[in-house]
Swiss-Prot record:
Family, as annotated: Belongs to the prokaryotic molybdopterin-containing oxidoreductase family. NasA/NapA/NarB subfamily.
Reactions catalysed according to its record: 2 Fe(II)-[cytochrome] + nitrate + 2 H(+) = 2 Fe(III)-[cytochrome] + nitrite + H2O
Cofactor binding mode and count: Binds 1 [4Fe-4S] cluster. Binds 1 molybdenum-bis(molybdopterin guanine dinucleotide) (Mo-bis-MGD) cofactor per subunit.
Biological function: Catalytic subunit of the periplasmic nitrate reductase complex NapAB. Receives electrons from NapB and catalyzes the reduction of nitrate to nitrite.
Native source species: Pseudomonas aeruginosa (strain ATCC 15692 / DSM 22644 / CIP 104116 / JCM 14847 / LMG 12228 / 1C / PRS 101 / PAO1)
Upper lineage: Bacteria, Pseudomonadati, Pseudomonadota, Gammaproteobacteria, Pseudomonadales
Superkingdom of the source species: Bacteria
Protein name per UniProt: Periplasmic nitrate reductase
Domain 4Fe-4S Mo/W bis-MGD-type: 36-92
Keywords: 4Fe-4S, Electron transport, Iron, Iron-sulfur, Metal-binding, Molybdenum, Nitrate assimilation, Oxidoreductase, Periplasm, Signal, Transport
Database matches in InterPro entries: Asp_de-COase-like_dom_sf (IPR009010), CT_Nitrate-R-NapA-like (IPR041957), MoPterin_dinucl-bd_dom (IPR006657), Mopterin_OxRdtase (IPR006656), Mopterin_OxRdtase_4Fe-4S_dom (IPR006963), MopterinOxRdtase_cofactor_BS (IPR027467), Periplasm_NO3_reductase_lsu (IPR010051), Prok_molybdopt-oxidoreductase (IPR050123)
Length: 829
């Protein structure tokens, strides 16, 4: 079933010379080892936040290994981490700006030709200024990333929300963590987990909800496995819509019908109440109850019949207060019998799961990832798991924790904490709150009224607005939405190729997105720049620049800041705004945002000796330090405290809030969290009354389900060897050879009934599109009958041509786990 590495799609004369095979090699001999220089850095891949030691020689990364001093991974890596040294050296690395041209000038139908950075910024400025003049700030936008460094995301946020006055900036974390964000915000009034990875060694029970930790968070899974095999009382429950590698450790394996996790969660709450397992003292002191809006729609276009039918599509994130008695009545219909019947999970397993949570002598950690979050009711699923932990009081203490795991290295640190979502500002502030806008404007030293009140376009909406011609200039960095976005052919590609639009992609390789763009900017990656990530346990980690980027590639930070020099306030701010700050009139956005007396206050001499820093060389001051310290001002004294900049280069990361030099492992609990008042025990201080909310939320069906024409469920996701769209891992020969192609995992009986067999080539067809791939009936993923699983890493099998662009109406996060498809035979094999 292995196939040769496919030829990259045609990429223009300027990119000529791209070989068919992309190789990366860094063989190290014993004699070479003595000349290696080692430094620490967080891994470039997932949100676990492993630390690695990076070896450089002659200006190149030549080796990596797990950092034995790191608390997260304790010296080990997953298979992707072991090949980190090769991700930067694929032979099709982008090294020059490339513009679509014909007859020496830009042409949207032209071929890519190399240009200078000066020319690139010239046409970008021309397009941005024309759109802003013609249609205002709503016509420009940016799609960023949970892979941005902290200061890259912060600089982008400032440039768009303050400089260009457009809230149309959103990260690809919208696709992966937005439901977790809104779940935290609704239940606790603050974002991010209250626990930490130390819970793993302290708990008696692990419950995985829609999380294949064995492949997606393998280093954490090794810690879970060690705990399970070392302590006989420890139990592991795994819930998913299909069987995967995490089931190998499960004491309670449960495959449920798609969307019925909502029923199971409400059943557990009902069981806790009816069995007398409610922690009455905890609930009375620390919890209040609310009934959330129901029938809230599916985040589709407003003219979609499902949206027209929904009663509360415009009131999705609203609720009314109720009491405990009303909540108990609400969950009462979610009986064991009903739950077993509708979920397909045997009753005895459901009851055993409920008992894990109900037993007052047993500690429980709940882990979840995309199975919960990529869900049309993902926010509800998050709220419902918090309900269970709050009813039992199993929260905010060692071994008792509801824990949302992140998929990107800085989805927490950059997307969430920095606030690069279209509705957010740093440290949980939001653009719709006038006091929050005032705080940001004061810290940023811009006039009152600079930041717009209206929420910008979220990720899926950006694609729709590009298609509709509302959004006309679009810049993406560290993302590959043409492969990762939903419903690509109907809702993503049309907007990118709309002749009225201009699309810029900053990336390191010619991804599917890059090849659909008008202008490609070559970016520096990982240790080619100084950076900071924030992982899933609130741990902020720094690294130094260790090598130079190839050719003319530049960091995303340099691109953003240098581009800001192309605008003056007169060109982008209205006269009434400038009248409030006449001293800013005529200044560039670079002067206003980045030479503002705060960002530029740290001299180049503050840089640690012996390290390069291309941005310090370019701008003449320690811009990373200045951006970080300005950003940190948002959270200090408000429960989001970060340590001083220099502390992070010394440590293997620190978990916020960091107060008086001490990190916080468990939030909201007295004795661990410095923000909790003495004698209170627990304070959920995100809300003024310092109480968390338990939500009454029902089961509601998915946006699309199998029928006679499309009889299978489709779920998408990842595999161990590849990360997201494979733009890095597919260029590592060892990882590519291990898993060269995306496969259609299906039940053997389904294959037999369709007259297929393992290796058969099929079409996966939905109402939106189709792909070709081969069938796999054995191996790591074992779907139940009626469901197929296809990973999305393969650029030659774009499964997101098939997926539905339904989202959670509260979080606006896409549901990649549930749509209807049919399977058609092409070649039997």
């Amino acid at each position: 079933m292995n196939s040769p590495r496919p030829t990259p799609p045609p990429f223009a004369a300027a990119a000529a010379g791209l070989p068919i095979l992309v190789r990366a090699s860094n063989l190290v001999t014993e004699a070479d080892v003595t000349s290696l220089v080692w430094n620490k850095a967080p891994c470039r891949f997932c949100g676990t936040g492993c630390s690695v030691m990076v070896a450089t020689r002659d200006g190149q990364v030549v080796a990596t290994h797990g950092d034995i001093k790191a608390e997260v991974n304790r010296g080990i890596n997953c298979v992707k981490g072991y090949f980190l040294s090769k991700i930067m050296y694929g032979s099709d690395r982008l090294t020059r700006p490339l513009l679509r041209m014909k007859d020496g000038k830009f042409d949207k139908q032209g071929e890519f030709q190399p240009i200078s950075w000066e020319q690139a910024f010239d046409i970008m400025a021309e397009k941005f200024k024309a759109a802003l003049k013609a249609k205002g700030p709503e016509s420009v936008g940016m799609f960023g990333s949970g892979q941005w460094t902290v200061w890259e995301g912060y600089a982008a946020n400032k440039l768009f929300k303050a400089g260009l006055r457009s809230n149309n900036i959103d990260p690809n974390a919208r696709h992966c963590m937005a439901s977790a964000v809104m779940g935290f915000m609704r239940s606790f009034g603050m974002d991010e987990p209250m626990g930490c990875y130390d819970d793993i060694e302290a708990t008696d029970s692990f419950v995985l909800w829609g999380s294949n930790m064995a492949e997606m968070h393998p280093v954490l899974w090794s810690r879970v496995t060690d705990r399970r095999l070392s302590a006989p009382q420890v139990k592991v429950a795994v819930l998913s819509t299909f069987e995967h590698r995490s089931f190998e450790l499960a004491d309670l394996p449960m495959v449920f019908k798609p969307q019925t996790d909502l029923i199971i969660l409400n059943y557990i709450a009902n069981h806790i109440i009816e069995s007398g397992a409610v922690n009455r003292d905890f609930v009375e002191r620390h919890v209040r109850f609310a009934h959330g809006a129901e029938d809230i729609g599916y985040g589709l276009r407003p003219d979609d019949p499902l949206e027209k039918k929904a009663k509360n599509a415009d009131k999705a994130n609203t609720w009314s207060d109720i009491d405990f008695k009303a909540f108990a009545e609400f969950v009462k219909p979610y009986t064991l019998e009903r739950t077993a019947r509708e979920s397909g999970v045997p009753a005895e397993r459901l009851k055993a799961l409920a008992e894990l949570y109900a037993d007052p002598k047993r500690k429980v950690v709940s882990f979840w990832t995309m199975g919960f979050n990529q869900h049309t009711r993902g926010v509800w699923a998050n709220n419902l798991i918090y309900n269970i932990h709050l009813l039992t009081g199993k929260i905010s203490e060692p071994g008792n924790s509801p824990f949302s795991l992140t998929g990107q290295p800085s989805a927490c640190g950059t997307a969430r904490e920095v606030g690069t979502f279209s509705h957010r500002l740093p440290a949980d502030l939001v653009v719709t709150n006038p006091k929050h806008r005032e705080t940001a404007e004061k810290i940023w030293k811009v006039p009152a009224g600079t930041i717009q009140e209206k929420v910008g376009f979220h990720a899926v909406q950006q694609s729709r607005m590009l298609k509709d011609g509302v959004l006309n200039v679009y810049w993406t960095q560290v993302s590959n939405n043409m492969q990762a976005g939903p419903n690509v052919m109907q809702e993503v590609l049309p907007g990118w190729r709309n002749p009225d639009n201009f699309v810029i992609v900053s990336d390191v390789y010619p991804t599917v997105s890059a090849q659909a763009a008008d202008l490609i900017l070559p970016s520096a990656m990982w240790v080619e720049k100084e950076g900071a990530f924030g992982n899933a346990e609130r741990r902020t980690q720094f690294w130094h620049q260790l090598v130079k980027a190839p050719g003319e590639a530049k960091s995303d930070l340099w691109q953003l800041v240098e581009f800001s020099k192309r605008f003056t306030t007169d060109e982008v701010w209205p006269a009434e705004l400038l009248a409030k700050a006449p001293e800013l009139k005529g200044k560039t956005l670079y002067d206003v945002l980045f030479r503002n007396g705060q960002v530029d206050r740290f001299p180049a001499s503050d840089l640690a000796k012996g390290y390069a820093n291309d941005e310090v060389d370019a701008f003449g001051f320690y811009i990373q330090k200045g951006l970080f310290e300005e950003y940190a001002a948002f959270g200090r004294g408000h429960g989001h405290d970060l340590a001083p900049f220099d502390a992070y280069h010394e440590a293997r990361g620190l978990r916020w809030p960091v107060v008086d030099g001490k990190e916080t492992r468990w939030r909201y609990r007295e004795g661990y969290d410095p923000y909790v008042s003495k004698g209170s025990g627990v304070q959920f201080y995100g809300y003024p009354d310092k109480k968390a909310i338990v939500f009454a939320l029902p089961y509601e069906p998915p946006a699309e389900a199998p029928d006679q024409d499309y009889p299978f469920w489709l779920a998408t996701g990842r595999v161990l060897e590849h990360w997201h769209t494979g733009s890095m891992t597919a260029r590592v020969p060892e990882l590519y050879k291990a898993v060269p192609d995306a496969l259609v995992y299906m039940h053997p009986e389904d294959a037999r009934q369709l007259k297929l067999r393992r290796g058969s080539e099929v079409k996966v067809v939905s109402r939106r599109g189709e792909i070709r791939a081969r069938v796999e009936t054995r191996g790591r993923n074992k779907p139940p009958q009626g469901l197929v699983f296809v990973p999305f890493f393969d650029a030659n099998k774009l499964i997101n041509k098939v997926t539905l662009d339904a989202t959670d109406p509260i979080s606006k996060q896409t549901d990649y786990k549930k749509c209807a498809v049919r399977i058609e035979l092409l070649n039997l094999a």
